[in-house]
Amino acid sequence: VIQSAKAIGCSVVNIGAQDITDGREHLILGLIWQIVRRGLLNSIDLKHHPELYRLLEEGETHEDFLKLPPDQILLRWFNYHLKAAHWHRRVSNFSKDVSDGENYTILLSQIKPDQCDRAPLQQQDLLARAEMILQRADAIGCRKYLTPGSMLAGNPKLNLAFVAHLFNTWPSLEPLQDAPPVEEFDAEGEREARVFTLWLNSLDVQPGVFNLFEDLKDGNILLQSFDK
């Protein structure tokens, strides 16, 4: 299990086989979260979703956008839909900014307006509002990871997982006709780049590596790898 987790880029510096055998809950949960997070965020990039070019801000370059980690791209996507809905609020985190359910209500009504209305905004009881929101998420096949209580508590991990699942299921971004090409590799070169990316992440370098060539440009990640 440890070697398999390491092979997909999880940091395993603080957990060993004995910890799993002994049932050390906090270490096991930490490893499970890394595995889930990687699976959810793996395809949130320009290569898999070239329509993400719509999220570029004024003056931002293609190279700048490539440097964004997937969680920041998700926040950008969330805010894109809030803006499109002419909503007055924006999100900068997966905790307090989503805990009252207002922004989720707008996001869902924007990505699937035929099945998700804004009725939860009329509910003043926040726990009941959270349940209404998740009922609408269920209607579009996205009631996963989050509970009313964890939404209200502003659990950042579960909220991130929920938003990632929404994006992976309903990105709701119009395709672009003239998106700049993302650098392609032959199959062998792409496999090698992926192997190096996973290996670096298994060393627990900070920040994590998502775009190998962009993230290595300043040399910081390489210096960290030498010290491991």
Question: How would you name each of these model-derived features?
Answer:
Residues 1-228:
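Alpha-helical coiled-coil scaffolding segments
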